[in-house]
Amino acid sequence: MKAIIFFCFLSVMVFIVAEASSLEALKIFEGERECVGENGHCRSWYNDCCDGYYCSCMQPPNCICRNNNG
């Protein structure tokens, strides 16, 4: 009986760890990160510049975030 309870507990723990690591991997895969400020490197296809900035790719792949007002 103790072996069955231990196995159930172990299974639950493995499931929790696997679920947590898959969610973290999903965040990394989706490219979640902080936004990029002025003159920071960006990706034109991902819109990762902060609000008020746009990604300028005059010399790809060296794209940088530029101010919308300037």
From Swiss-Prot:
PROSITE patterns: MU_AGATOXIN. GO terms for cellular component: extracellular region. SUPFAM superfamilies: omega toxin-like. Residues 1-20 form the signal peptide. Residues 21-33 form a propeptide. Disulfide bonds join C35-C50, C42-C55, C49-C65, C57-C63. Expressed by the venom gland. Insecticidal neurotoxin that modulates the insect Nav channel (DmNaV1/tipE (para/tipE)) in a unique manner, with both the activation and inactivation processes being affected. The voltage dependence of activation is shifted toward more hyperpolarized potentials (analogous to site 4 toxins) and a non-inactivating persistent sodium current is induced (site 3-like action). Interestingly, both effects take place in a voltage-dependent manner, producing a bell-shaped curve between -80 and 0 mV. Negative results: does not affect mammalian sodium channels (Nav). The presence of a 'disulfide through disulfide knot' structurally defines this protein as a knottin. Belongs to the neurotoxin 07 (Beta/delta-agtx) family. 04 (aga-5) subfamily. This is Mu-agatoxin-Ao1b.
